[in-house]
Amino acid sequence: MEKILHMAEGIDIGEMPSYDLMLPKPSKGQKRYLSTYDGQNPPKKQAGSKFHVRARFEPVHFVASSSKAERQEDPYGPQTKDVNGRTHFASMPRNFYQDYTQDSFSIQDGNSQYCNSSGFIFTKDQPVATNMYFDSGNPAPSSTSQQANCQPAPEPPPSQMYPESLVAEKQYFIEKLTATIWKNLSNPEMTSGSDKINYTYMLTRCIQACKTNPEYIYAPLKEIPPADIPKNKKLLTDGYACEVRCQNIYLTTGYAGSKNGSRDRATELAVKLLQKRIEVRVVRRKFKHIIGEDLVVCQIGMLSYEFPPALKPPEDLVVLGKDASGQPIFNSSAKHWTNFVITENANDAIGILNNSASFNKMSIEYKYEMMPNRTWRCRVFLQDHCLAEGYGTKKTSKHAAADEALKVLQKTQPTYPSVKSSQCHSGSSPKGSGKKKDIKDLVVYENSSNPVCTLNDTAQFNRMTVEYVYERMTGLRWKCKVILESEVIAEAVGVKKSVKYEAAGEAVKTLKKTQPTVINNLKKGTVEDVISRNEIQGRSAEEAYKQQIKEDNIGNQLLRKMGWTGGGLGKSGEGIREPISVKEQHKREGLGLDVERVNKIAKRDIEQIIRNYARSESHSDLTFSTELTNDERKQIHQIAQKYGLKSKSHGVGHDRYLVVGRKRRKEDLLDQLKQEGQVGHYELVMPQAN
């Protein structure tokens, strides 16, 4: 600053423009504007010399000096780094702003003659910027301290839950993850092959490349208060919210109508966020009615952040203390490995261990070591306790170690009592019917090869309830009981994932031995009497062709008067013999007509077919071919409902067809089947054993 003033000595540029707000001068004949000194003596103007020494340039405090010593002392130079070489991004904006405002106000107080004479506009605008900065949630100093004391803004107390060493470690991990994201984005295998990038696969692959796994926390939107849901997401009523975390660091939150959709939306936002300049901060977030500290990833340079409420309970993030190396010990580490509870919701041992660790909120880790004979040894650690080890290749050793670890954990599992969890599939029984129905009146309704579907259809057909009750046996084995109307039909023992299918199969076999079975053959083969598109369109053509020209027709009378007696037209009768058939014209058909619109079937033709079927006494169903479009099938559904018929579509895609039939009671269908043996595509099979 002294150098600039020294350079500007002796230079006079005349009067400088004023940056203060000035009122316009009143015109002649008008009264002057009222001022703050009305009724008082206005202050006298101080006499001053017109010519005096004035700085040629306005003093700008961020001009750097040229010497190395001054550059080192410059508080606005490069930011200092810690011992590990990583920048403390979290402290950079606040420290920089405090030094900046402090020097600015010191210039105002120390060099007031230059500020007042030249209208130092930068310092005049400074309080506005200060308010803008501290409106984002940081405590703002009072105006008195800005003008008089010039004290910097008070810093918040350091976090006791997350020490600086932990934040620096998480910052290093996020920088490593960001580099991995950019590396995968430049990989053509990740972006080519499809128009849309699979962000979930990319984020999972990048996080696993950093030797860890992502964490997804789901919550139904019904359980979240409406005030905590973003305004643009309030249209969702039955959706889900998904929070993505990694190493206890919050990344993003996604909202969608399903769990997979919310996860995909959250991972997409996370990948886009990791492509920017980001940092790890400790902020206060809300979880239901509790406010606690949390580690979050936010963009550098953004002063205000609006984070959605946390979906993970804050008690899962509590630091209980520090170990010998100074690292924090979290609540999950306080659990002993013997309290581990196995949840059998996977097929292999690795999946069971990972899912169980997530359920118990414990940490499981696999460590590899190459042996002298060029084989790999994999050891499984649960809560830093070695459970088992396996040998082989890097892949087979992990599976072998997981199998051995699972056997060790199964031995330590306590003997649980029968843990029951039921799934009830109830039929459409009438309300208020509390009478228990007899199993002897049950009719097995077989509409699928899956025994679970057969049992559910049977329960709905007979208006009964079916339940599947699980009982935990030893190890990974479970017992499943099938209960129909409070009566046990069958049971099976096996793995939880397949024991339900086995128990349902045994129940169907047991019921077929004593109860009649109605088999629906509609899905088992092609239907013979299928109504095609041409058959529907041919009805209009046949009716138009059958129309007879009457004697009082004007055209007929004109031809008779000209000598036509019948037969072909023309002198020798070589013309047409039959009248021109009526051609239907929809709306304004003509040049440029879409061919597909011409091939559409008429609604009155469909209604005529269904009306004739409803008035007849036929017991077979109407089956429309797969040539019909979605709109045409929609019309058939509406017309069938109009005449009190039931309609249902079967198949997928181009193989989808529609069946229209009568609403039958179970008793009427059984009576017809007993008399005729087969009604339409229904077939009756009597019990195999008495």
UniProtKB/Swiss-Prot annotation:
Residues recorded as bearing Phosphoserine in the entry: 618
Biased composition (Polar residues): 139-150, 414-425
Keyword Transcription regulation among record annotations: yes
The keyword Repressor appears for this protein: yes
Region of interest (Active repression domain), residue spans: 1-296
Protein name: NF-kappa-B-repressing factor
Record location of the Glycyl lysine isopeptide (Lys-Gly) (interchain with G-Cter in SUMO2) cross-link: 68, 500, 666, 674
DNA-binding positions: 296-388
Record-annotated G-patch domain positions: 551-596
CDD domains per record: R3H_NRF
Region entry Disordered, spans: 27-49, 65-85, 133-160, 414-436
Main location: nucleus
UniProt keywords, alphabetically: DNA-binding, Isopeptide bond, Nucleus, Phosphoprotein, Repressor, Transcription, Transcription regulation, Ubl conjugation
